[in-house]
Amino acid sequence: MKAVVLAGGKSSRMGQDKALILFNEKPLLLHIANILQEVNSKVYISGKKGAYNSFPYPQIADVYPEKGPLGGIYSALEYCKDDTLVCPCDMPFINTYVLHFLLLNYDSTRINVLEFNEQIFPTLGIYPYNVASALKTFIENDILQLQKVLTALNAQKIAYPVHPNTKKYFTNLNTPEDLKIQTFSN
């Protein structure tokens, strides 16, 4: 199994590349890649071609540019030719406990995504290599909504236990306001 940081988003609501925003004095991309490396030694970055050359992880260019997270996940599967743990670059509080929980509960025959408090996180999951051709078909038919793909492919939703302190793990940073709130609450 390989691990991939999804960093190809437009970051339009943030107004700057989220992957490069500093979090605890490190770019978010590097922060997430380092966490992934604690659970899997084969870590890659999926995103815009050449955008992250300064980082010490191999890069995966999008096979189908501008196709959102689905395009990044497909590109990762095609590059790695293996089951792939994916994590977005904008979830700074994700940790090895959450990732180990996902790994311990995953079914190798289908897509596995984490669910927390009845919210599904399609970019935080394990995608088996055997779904690559199906993902390609969705992309070629311009069906890019991950929720539709997950439903069509009967993805397993792995419910992470809800406790008062675990909500933060699933926080996404999408806007400058999100960043300010998390900076002050961290």
Kindly give the residue locations of the regions a language model identified.
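Nucleotide and nucleotide-moiety/phosphate-recognizing core
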Residues: 1-146, 151-168, 180-184
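Dinucleotide-binding Rossmann-like beta1-alpha1 core, especially the glycine-rich loop
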Residues: 171
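A broadly conserved detector of short glycine/acidic/proline-rich loop/turn motifs that flank catalytic sites
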Residues: 177
